[in-house]
UniProtKB/Swiss-Prot annotation:
The keyword Lyase does not apply. GO terms for biological process: cell division; protein import. This is Tol-Pal system protein TolB. PANTHER family: PROTEIN TOLB, PROTEIN TOLB HOMOLOG. The lineage of its organism: Bacteria, Pseudomonadati, Pseudomonadota, Gammaproteobacteria, Pseudomonadales. It comes from Pseudomonas entomophila (strain L48). Transmembrane segments: none annotated. It comes from the Bacteria.
Amino acid sequence: MIKRLRGLLVLLCCVAGMAMAEEKNILVTSGSDRATPIAVVPFGVQGGSVLPEDMADIISNDLRNSGYYGPIPRQNMISLPTQASEVIFRDWKALGAQYVMVGSIVPSGGRLQVSYALFNVATEQQVLTGSVAGGVDQLRDMAHYIADQSFEKLTGIKGAFSTRMLYVTAERFSTNNTRYTLQRSDYDGARAVTLLQSREPILSPRFAPDGKRIAYVSFEQKRPRIFIQHIDTGRREQITNFEGLNGAPAWSPDGTRLAFVLSKDGNPDIYVMNVASRQITRVTAGPGINTEPFWGKDGNTLYFTSDRGGKPQIYKQSVGGGGAERVTFVGNYNANPKLSADEKTLVMIHRQQGFTNFKVAAQDLQRGSVKILTETSLDESPTVAPNGTMLIYATRQQGRGVLMLVSLNGRVRLPLPTAQGEVREPSWSPYLN
């Protein structure tokens, strides 16, 4: 749907031939200062048991993905302590590490008891210690938990490594035979499970704030309709059946309302539905396309994409009515708005004046400056971690749709492992614990 709307917006803008908005703000190219060096030493495993995954490696990758920390490569480690008494601080000072984590794992009867400790290398003081237990099949959960605890202790920001992600894959077997699969995985693409399969497109999956329900668009009736699905049971409810476009669902912060796009009255406009009563209220009106709503934390403000000024730009408007206020001014295309957790940063799909590529960018809402976050092109569907430190987006590499993870500070850019086929439409979960 985003691709279709992008094409429609661009086409309308070209036909209109209207002058581009004045570039009032500043464009900043992405820079990258050095991340804080940290060493996550391989955890010792009692009895030499072989575990299905490397817990320390998962923790290290989590901390790296945040963009705050740069893990010391294992091949550079001078010593490999597994408990506090074995830490030789001069080894880590020689490597320039500011923090070092050690840990040990005790397997017993299909369960794991994990102990860990984190040290400040300069002060030689312990800053965090803890333990966690679970089944072998929960190894990744425990690793993400330790990374969450460590990240919050060091930064004061709640970790988002135990969250999940939704995305859609499309596998084409022949001209008229494509299988679409809605998947849920760890935020890093691991442990994907199938929530829905269809021979018709699935678009715009979105987690509810409780993390237990999702909304999405399905074409299973040969036309777009919005569904709500309960993750645990798989129970589904169709909630729209209007003529024309039914798309771009977005949950309100309290989970009681859905904003979405309908074209039943002519142009695509944004409506809000009370999920319990199914009553809808129209929010936007007038000429042009209004689409891709995203809620502010106050539950009263909607950010959205509109071409009302001649080119796709981002606006905000009260759900209760009133005029829309334009938010973006840099570039001749800004769409698909997402807000960081503190609502100081607007993440969007952006095209610079004079360029043809679409990139993920972040706008400082106080200063108005815009920073390009990605080095790919044809980017779409950015989704931001609940703590605002990372984002995932869809793009194309070597002719295939893939997902990429980027830290908002610009230090980390990496592809996520996903299933075969075209991968698109990522959506980050809220905190789940």
